[in-house]
Amino acid sequence: MGMKIGIIGYGYIGRALVERVQNSAGRFELAFIHNRNSAVLADIEPSLQLDDLANVAETAPDLIVECAHPSFTQNYGETFLKCANYMPLSVTALADDGLRDRLEQTALENGTKLYLPAGALIGGEALLMRGDEWQRVRITFRKHPDNIDFSESEYDPAQINGETVVYEGPVRGIAHQYPRNVNTMVTCALVSTGLDACEARLIADPALDCAIAEVEAWSKDGSIIRTEKSAPMVGVSGTEMIDSTWTSIQRASGGLMGA
């Protein structure tokens, strides 16, 4: 029997993960699929559809992967960790220190794990490896306004006519203003200098046809890491997110080296 995966969200990423689980030659199997609008699950057999996440333990999942919205971690994260390992892709939920502490404590008490997915972060392992040695870390995103969710911010994307810095400051602040866009920034902060010290910049540029992520890190010993990655976008997600998430799932199953 393969590792049982529960998937929350049946959009661009969720659909791709379901397909990969189904094509994994028995290495993985589906425990359940949940979507806020259950009508979207018309192509999923009813026995795999889970309407009420409060009943998640009945599906006996080994790993639950959230690929929908940070509110699922806020509302159900502790419930999930009481019965399974949990991997939230909407990492911005973990910018809440109190919530993160509760999730970590729940995992400790129940022998489960809270996984931090790699997401679109390039160089995350190098950042984690050096730990407290980083003196300064900065992460910059450049995206077309159409690929940024401005609903929690003060900006009207229709008024952005050229390259515009829509946020510059600590990662903790941007996580609240752009919760669907900056999961990788939160991951970067959590594995390096922390949510208040790690610097974030979000630049909206109508001239872009891709998303660009830049990470810069300066160590106390004078060493420097600089990475830059560009990728096509689908909605607010980069197209590489599917491969990255699948790799994180394989690692969580023990099939690949790494965390």
What are these regions (language model features)?
Residues E66, P88, L114-A118:
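General beta-strand structural signal in soluble alpha/beta enzymes
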Residues V91-T112:
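Rossmann-fold NAD(P)-binding glycine/threonine-rich loop
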Residues S24-I44:
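NAD(P)-binding Rossmann-fold cofactor-contacting core
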Residues I44-L53:
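Active-site regions of enzymes building and remodeling cell-envelope glycoconjugates
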Residues I8, Y115, A120-A259:
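Active-site-lining helix/loop region of Rossmann-like oxidoreductase modules
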Residues K4-L17:
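Glycine-rich adenosine-cofactor-binding loop
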Residues L30-R36, Q49, I64-C67:
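Short, hydrophobic beta-strand segments that form beta-sheet elements in well-ordered domains
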Residues L53-N55, T59-L81, A93-D97:
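Beta-loop-alpha module in the N-terminal Rossmann-like domain of NAD(P)-dependent dehydrogenases
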